[in-house]
């Protein structure tokens, strides 16, 4: 998300199934931020997105004033449900917005915002810890980055990315590669990359010591190249 259009959390309110749990909404927020943070490019996060920032579904808050643009940096109060956003760019969707904004199940609590922030900060630590996730050159990216298991046979909702430092000039003196799996599906996934059999992969220390218990269940089978 950015300053234009809905915030990332508000997009989830509009696009995810209405019965999606708040815990899964937090995970989707983290996953969405991960696709930016771990994808080589300079990362751009909208202010407050790590706290599930809401503008009450306002898609253009430039002239909406402090009421719709405010952020509680203490993480104690979500601004979701502050009222119907101004008519200028939103009135056509008021009928859709009104019941959503009135639903207390869609308003994050302090614990939800804290979980989202902790997971988001873990992502920044991962990016800082692994130089291979910020190669800094289009030529290096083209040379070292690939997407195993992509194409027609890809698992729906899952993207596997390999940054292979055994190809070309060495970038990271400590790591020979970085393997990233983005799983937007509702189920746990297994990805086999036979070409990586015999190589060793472990969670970064930021993940192994981080806030996400699900991420910590990740395993690597070197014999088969399966994560």
Task: Report each predicted region and the residues it spans.
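C-terminal beta-sandwich/jelly-roll accessory domains of carbohydrate-active enzymes
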Residues: 186-227
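Loop/helix patches that line or flank the sugar-binding groove of alpha-linked glycan CAZymes
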Residues: 1-179, 184-190, 198-199
